[in-house]
Structure formats: C-alpha cells, structure tokens
Amino acid sequence: MNRRFIFLFFIVAFVGLLPFRSPAPLIYAPGEGWYYEPAGSNAKWTRTRAKDQLEVAEEAFKNQDYSTTLHAAYRVLKVWPLSDYAPRAQYLVGRCLEMEHRDEAAFDKYQDLLKKYPRTDSYDEILWRQYEIANRFYGGQFFRIFWGYLPLYTSMDETAKMYGKIVNNGPYSDVAPHAQLQIGAAREKDKDYEAAVKAYETAADRYHNQPVIAADAMYRWAITYQKQSTKAEYDQGKAGQAIAAYTDFITVFPDDKRVAAAQQAITMLKAEQVRGSFVVAQFYENSKTLSATQRRNGAIVYYNEVLQLNPNSPYAAQARQRIEALKPLLQNPPAS
C-alpha cells in the first residue's frame, strides 16, 4: 500500500466523519426520478388548495420551468386525485415530459390520463399528441431506460404497440385511421409482413367509408403481399395474393393516381409467377430425395404451369422442351 493511497484514504475518512447538516436535498418522485431541492425551497411552489396548486403548475409551464411544473402537478395528483383539477395536472405532466424529450414516459402519462379521466376535454388532443410521439419513434427515435434519461434502442414492435393503444383509446376518433395505417407501416418496416397485412386489412375494412384511408390501406396491403412474394420463391401463393390485392384496389378505386403503378406491379408479379413456377419445376427435376417418378411428375406439373401463366414468356420454350423430354420417361422409365 503506497503512501499516496494512504493519504487519499485519510482524506475521505476525514470528510466522512465531519459533522454537517443534511436536509436530504435529493428527492425521488415517481415519474420524475431524482431531483435536487434545497431545504425549504418547496414552500415557493406548494399550496394548500388544489386550484392554487394547479395555477402554480400552469404559470411555471408558461415560463418553461418544467421542473417546478412537474412538482406542482404531481402534488395536485397526490393530494387531490379526485378533484376537478387532477386531469389538467396529469396533462401538464405529460406536456413537461414531452418538452424534456422523455417521450415514452409522456406517452404513458397521457395513457394514464385517458384511463383515469376518460371525460377530459382534452381527449382528442391527447390522442394526437400520442400519435405524434409514436411517429417520432417510427422515424427512428430511441427508446430510453433509467426513467427515460438514457437512449438505448429503436423498436418497431414497441412503436406498433403504441399506435395500437391509440386506436384502442378511440377506434373512431379522427386520429385512429391514421394510427391503424401506421401499425401496418411499423410492422412492414420490421419485416413482419403477416402482421402488416392484417393491420392494413383492418384499416380498409373498419374505415371503408373514408376513401383516402381505405385506398391507402388497400394499396399498401398489396405492396406488402408483393414484398412477401419476393421472399417466397417456392410459394407462389403470395404473388397470387398480391395480384388479387392490386386488382381489388384498381376495381374499387379506378381513379386513384396509383392505378398505373398497380397495373405495372401486376405485370411484374405475373412475370415473377412464371419464373417462380419454372424454378419449382427445376427443383423437382433435380431433387435428390424424391423418387424418379415423383421428380418427373412434379416437374411436368410446374412446367405446364409456366405455359398456362404465359405461353409466350422467356421460360416457355425451355418448359416445352423439358415436358417433351420428361413425358416419355414416365411412359417408359429406364431400367434401374
């Protein structure tokens, strides 16, 4: 143990043993975390009536003193939770947390407000505020830990759940159709295409009387099926579903500006169906696990599908050649 360490040890011990007054300036408040408050300073913002306490919170918020706003608003909620002033206090808590960029905590406080005080006059505004918060997370904002202070990760799953809460809070509110679409967008961004399709389907069905929303839902529904089809080379069902979805979109919204793009997508998907069937036919023909008869039968089925889908495709000639080569082998299989 060197002399420097011994010296530091005695300094720390000396300071620790000094008598001093500790008015416990560090205080923890649920939702706020730890904050510093010198002894006696709370007299500046505490009041004995809910109305007066809320006025302190309002004035502090107006002056961008969010720390005092939170203290005063939380006091209203703690001391007078059933008063007429509690909903506004809860609202101010959410607003302060937003201003401090603690969006996840703000969202939760707004959620608590809607559950505890469902008749609040700010209901629609709060839904829109929740929507804007969710949009920020959709745009890549990080979720935080340690009472909302440390940004750590992005999550489209948690973002989609936020949009889901907004829809559940008011399924037929003005913001709900947009939030429902965003559930699909978040799931799509997360490459959870099955969940995305379901979300878009819900939007198109529930808000069918809102043409802008319904059209957007149907179009994005078709796009999501198309994305699935590119990842399912041996399952041409997704391409067929995408074609059907685009066709429905064109039928229901023939004047939509995206019809031309939908028609082009259908053409591409049909070409992809042909290519996919050809790939599956080759898979059967070259399989090492199937019997010779199974390989030839399977290959012929899918080569025929290539011709049925488009007899003039770039794959058609080769498909015909392979059918002509395989059929005689089925009738007269070579001796094993």
Would you name each region that the model predicts?
Residues 20-336:
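Acidic, polar-rich low-complexity tracts and alpha-helical solenoid repeat scaffolds
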